[in-house]
């Protein structure tokens, strides 16, 4: 009986993906993210609020979904929004290639095509990589889940404030403002 061996995708394969979407390298597979309108609107609303706060207070660098972060697991993940504190890049030079460190904040915005298992896998991987704050925002349900660890988890509704806590000091916005 013949067996077939599946070749694991590499970072080189990821570099050679077409420019028609956002791809991640996860456990030797190339995965493409399919985002909808509510996903894009919510992500951009958050960046429009978070970005100026980070720049004004010189807290660090905010990145969009096309930025790959090479995690200790070897996976290259592209959070919808991510933040890296000032002082973490050598000489404060942001790399032109993938970011070779775990963000301080990752944000995943839920899309209709997302499976709960994929989201939880991402959250677990981010936390295991040392990301101190993870937000999962669901525009369809108008809620967010805030993770500091797998046991320190809070649910937020549209009237609750999404806060940067000690990771993005002073940042606060009403969650519902991201959906309106």
Positions of the model-derived regions?
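Gly/Pro/Ser/Thr-rich low-complexity, intrinsically disordered segments predominantly at protein N-termini
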Residues: 1-180
């Amino acid at each position: 009986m013949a067996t077939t061996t599946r070749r694991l995708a590499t970072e080189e394969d990821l570099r050679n993906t077409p420019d028609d979407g956002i791809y991640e390298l996860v456990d030797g597979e190339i995965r493409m993210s399919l985002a909808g309108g509510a996903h894009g609107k919510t992500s951009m609303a958050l960046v429009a609020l978070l970005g100026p706060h980070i720049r004004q207070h010189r807290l660090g660098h905010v990145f969009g979904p096309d930025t790959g972060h090479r995690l200790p697991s070897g996976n290259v993940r592209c959070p919808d929004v991510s933040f890296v504190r000032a002082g973490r890049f050598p000489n404060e030079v942001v790399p032109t290639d993938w970011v070779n460190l775990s963000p301080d904040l990752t944000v995943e915005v839920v899309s209709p095509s997302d499976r709960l298992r994929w989201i939880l896998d991402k959250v677990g991987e981010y936390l295991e990589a040392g990301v101190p704050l993870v937000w999962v925002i669901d525009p369809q349900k108008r809620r967010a889940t805030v993770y500091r660890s797998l046991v320190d988890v809070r649910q937020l509704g549209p009237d609750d404030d999404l806060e940067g806590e000690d990771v993005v000091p002073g940042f606060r916005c009403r969650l519902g403002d991201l959906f309106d």
